[in-house]
Every structure is written in C-alpha cells, then in structure tokens.
Amino acid sequence: MAATDVRPKITLACEECKHRNYITNKNRRNDPDRLAMKKFCPNCGTHRVHKETR
C-alpha cells in the first residue's frame, strides 16, 4: 500500500558532501521527476542544492 502512496516520504541529500539532511513529502502527481531544492547544509555551512535520493 505504501508503494502506491500519492505523497511518499523522500530524503534530500546535499550534492557536495552527500549528507542526507532533510526528509519531506512529495506529491507524485505534481512532481513525477526527481526533486531538487536549494536548502541549508549544516555540514557544509552554506546553502547548497539538495536532490532526492532513492
């Protein structure tokens, strides 16, 4: 049942240091592709692009 969930939980990882810093929900109908957001990375200490991980 969770595999067909409309709003699954996803993990966002920093592109630079690869740390998984954020967990959020995503609407599959609006965003079928991989999500990329600019968020603050506490490990790098700056704002970096975080991409959706599998």
From Swiss-Prot:
GO CC, any one term: ribonucleoprotein complex
Keywords: Ribonucleoprotein, Ribosomal protein
Keyword Ribosomal protein: yes
Gene Ontology molecular-function annotations: structural constituent of ribosome
GO aspect biological process, one term: translation
PANTHER family named in the record: 50S RIBOSOMAL PROTEIN L33, CHLOROPLASTIC (PTHR43168), LARGE RIBOSOMAL SUBUNIT PROTEIN BL33C (PTHR43168:SF2)
Family, similarity comment: Belongs to the bacterial ribosomal protein bL33 family.
HAMAP family: Ribosomal_bL33
Protein's name according to its UniProt entry: Large ribosomal subunit protein bL33B
Organism per entry: Saccharopolyspora erythraea (strain ATCC 11635 / DSM 40517 / JCM 4748 / NBRC 13426 / NCIMB 8594 / NRRL 2338)
